[in-house]
């Protein structure tokens, strides 16, 4: 089983000289979002851990066994500060024992003096529509649910109004993500789209009002 924590996240943090984390926030407990978090927690200290209000998945249970971080369950409308950066919890649905973890996905807006990013996990269209009237624009949007047609509704995209939309998705996946309808909606709202299945790992920086995106893929063929 490929562990993104030990194979990707930890080496990159060490490359950057990061030896501890002030905060780790997980959108929800599915393996493709929380997998690898336990390996990170086992190797570097974490001060605060923010989790969705859902039944803990196996990945989150493993994480909790490997950290002494202050445990915080996210609540809608709560803000946290990291220096000059604000972490805004826009939506934090409370999941039930029999609900899909996607329905508990956090929608989070990260804002600094340089720019803003909206993270959506696997948020559903229903959750997006409930937050469309509350969320402020974000220059960058992490597109929900790998670009599924069942997310990224036009009211939500209009509210966020992203310059750049990032789709984290595996090449040749069996779900057909990203969906053609989602790509059409992103084009209609004027967002530049970058995809990990085409571009590999992406690094995003802010330069004044401009958003810059760098690809770390060196081969033309799919991974």
Residue ranges with predicted function:
Residues 1-223:
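Non-globular, low-confidence helical/coil segments that flank catalytic cores
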């Amino acid at each position: 089983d490929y562990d993104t924590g030990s194979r990707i996240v930890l080496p990159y943090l060490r490359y950057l000289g990061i030896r501890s984390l002030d905060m780790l926030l997980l959108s929800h407990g599915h393996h493709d979002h929380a997998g690898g978090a336990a390996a990170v927690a086992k190797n570097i200290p974490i001060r605060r851990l923010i989790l969705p209000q859902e039944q803990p998945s196996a990945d989150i249970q493993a994480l909790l066994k490997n950290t002494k971080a202050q445990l915080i369950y996210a609540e809608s409308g709560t803000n946290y500060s990291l220096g000059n950066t604000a972490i805004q919890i826009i939506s934090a649905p409370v999941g039930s024992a029999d609900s899909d973890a996607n329905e508990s996905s956090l929608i989070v807006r990260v804002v600094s003096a340089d720019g803003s990013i909206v993270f959506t996990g696997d948020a559903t269209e229903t959750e997006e529509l409930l937050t469309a009237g509350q969320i402020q624009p974000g220059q960058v949007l992490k597109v929900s649910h790998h670009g599924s047609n069942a997310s990224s509704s036009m009211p939500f995209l209009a509210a966020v109004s992203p310059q750049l939309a990032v789709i984290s998705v595996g090449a040749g996946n069996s779900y057909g993500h990203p969906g053609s309808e989602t790509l059409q909606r992103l084009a209609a709202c004027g967002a530049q789209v970058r995809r990990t299945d085409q571009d590999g790992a992406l690094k995003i920086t802010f330069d004044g009002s401009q958003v810059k995106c760098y690809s770390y893929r060196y081969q033309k063929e799919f991974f």
